[in-house]
Swiss-Prot record:
This is UPF0260 protein Pmen_1776. Belongs to the UPF0260 family. Pfam families: CxxCxxCC. InterPro entries: Puta_zinc/iron-chelating_dom, UCP006173.
Length: 149
């Protein structure tokens, strides 16, 4: 009986989550919507502060989530089937944490109850991003913020 009192992310695998549980894991940091560059020599993935054209630069939410694939065909859609590849996600990402059997951080909205905590704790890049429409792709390297992995 005690196991059922555990939050869903502690008692279920990613593959066992229903759609609402899956979507609720997203903390709204927007980091997965930042443009990334891959080092050709070692395969390392680097995040830039260049945001997808659909990402709201303040709220860190997609401005057209339901239709994002139509507007951004290469938009990354995370699924439980990809869990073994989540190492490219930020170390704070709930999808990555749960896939690694780890708990959610204290600021995550499912723990804290505060959807703005991700911004207050400066986990998100809210207010610190640039739209991909404002930076030439050849200049993205000038805007690296961290290495994934």
């Amino acid at each position: 009986m005690a196991a059922n009192s555990e939050p869903f992310w502690k008692r279920k695998t990613l593959a066992q989550l229903d759609r609402d549980e899956w979507e609720s894991l997203c903390d709204g940091c927007g980091l997965c919507c930042l443009q990334k560059l891959e080092d050709e020599d070692d395969g390392a993935v680097y995040y830039t502060r260049i945001a997808c054209k659909l990402l709201d630069l303040q709220t860190c939410r997609c401005s057209d989530y339901a239709n994002r694939i139509k507007h951004v065909p290469d938009c990354i859609q995370l699924t439980p089937a990809q869990a073994d590849q989540f190492q490219w996600l930020p170390p704070t990402c709930a999808y990555r944490l749960v896939s690694e059997g780890r708990d959610l951080p204290h600021w995550h909205h499912l723990v804290s109850g505060d959807p703005d905590a991700v911004h207050a704790e400066r986990i998100s890049q809210s207010g610190r991003m640039l739209s991909e429409n404002s930076v030439a792709e050849e200049d993205w390297e000038e805007h690296l913020i961290f290495r994934a992995g």
